[in-house]
């Protein structure tokens, strides 16, 4: 994977990982001429003035994924060779949709959607003694992804993501959900970098599942850590931009 540069972002839930990836993606959209102007909302989501000169009548800004534009095809055919956002949990989430029948919007949605109850009961899991009732989307993702599959092979989701990056070979691959130490090391072993983010909106991360506590250990082996605990989104973006410009092989990708 000689010509693909990987940058991963590590941190707790809602630490700013997705926002960081969106900032870099928005920067590339403007640089590549996909949009004349780009910005991030207060929620860290990308807005653009246009997509390849297509606009929405009466709107100065629109979401980067408007209903009238097939953004996935845009990445498959054009943008994907320059920059693409990946997730270690991508294959897991799609599996839970395809095999367990979970709602795709909830599986790939926000925290409120992930905390929604599903049709699957804790009672179906013979080894579960303390949990009762219906499982939430988040609980299923944690159980299937970590307790089941990582129990069989701790590198299963890492390998799936890295193999996809190698297959698609974008110029810049961004990984938005680094949580475990082996995920950090996998990116570094491919010549990539991992940037840790310190923000932790929840005073006490859940102690009953390793996926909620593992990010704290990740920060110790990241290539650099940005203390974004009290930074606004624009301030975080500035720190990320300055940090990336000092990484080897990155300045040629992010101008």
Predicted regions and their residues:
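Short His-Asn-centered micro-motif
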Residues: 10, 88, 176-178
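Pre-Walker A (Motif I) flank of P-loop NTPase domains
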Residues: 2-7, 171
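ATP-dependent small-molecule kinase phosphotransfer cores
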Residues: 39-170
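Short catalytic-loop micro-motif centered on adjacent basic/acidic residues
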Residues: 83, 173-174, 227
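Small-molecule kinase domains that catalyze NTP-dependent phosphoryl transfer to phosphate-bearing small molecules
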Residues: 8-15, 22, 38-42, 46-48, ...
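A conserved segment at the C-terminal end of the G1
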Residues: 19-32
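A glycine-rich beta-strand to alpha-helix segment
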Residues: 173-177, 182-183
């Amino acid at each position: 994977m000689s010509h693909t540069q990987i940058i991963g972002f590590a941190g707790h839930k809602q630490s700013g990982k997705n926002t960081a990836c969106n900032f870099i993606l928005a920067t590339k959209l403007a640089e590549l001429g996909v949009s004349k102007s780009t910005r991030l909302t207060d929620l860290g989501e990308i807005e653009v003035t246009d997509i390849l000169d297509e606009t929405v009548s009466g709107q100065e800004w629109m979401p980067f994924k408007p209903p009238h534009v097939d953004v996935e095809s845009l990445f498959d055919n054009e943008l994907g060779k320059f920059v693409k956002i990946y997730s270690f949990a991508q294959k897991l989430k799609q599996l839970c949709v395809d095999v367990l029948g979970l709602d795709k919007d909830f599986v790939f949605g926000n925290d409120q959607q992930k905390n929604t109850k599903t049709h699957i009961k804790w009672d179906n899991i013979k080894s579960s003694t303390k949990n009762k009732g219906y499982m939430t989307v988040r609980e299923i993702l944690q159980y299937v992804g970590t307790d089941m599959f990582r129990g069989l092979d701790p590198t299963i989701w890492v390998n799936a993501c890295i193999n996809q990056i190698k297959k698609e070979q974008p110029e810049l691959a961004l990984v938005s959900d680094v949580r475990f130490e082996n995920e950090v090391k996998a990116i570094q072993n491919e010549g990539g970098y991992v940037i840790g983010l310190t923000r932790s909106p929840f005073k006490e991360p859940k102690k009953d599942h390793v996926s909620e506590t593992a990010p704290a250990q990740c920060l110790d082996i990241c290539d650099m850590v940005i203390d974004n605990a009290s930074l606004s989104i624009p301030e975080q973006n500035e720190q990320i931009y300055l940090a990336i410009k000092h990484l080897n092989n990155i300045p040629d990708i992010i101008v």
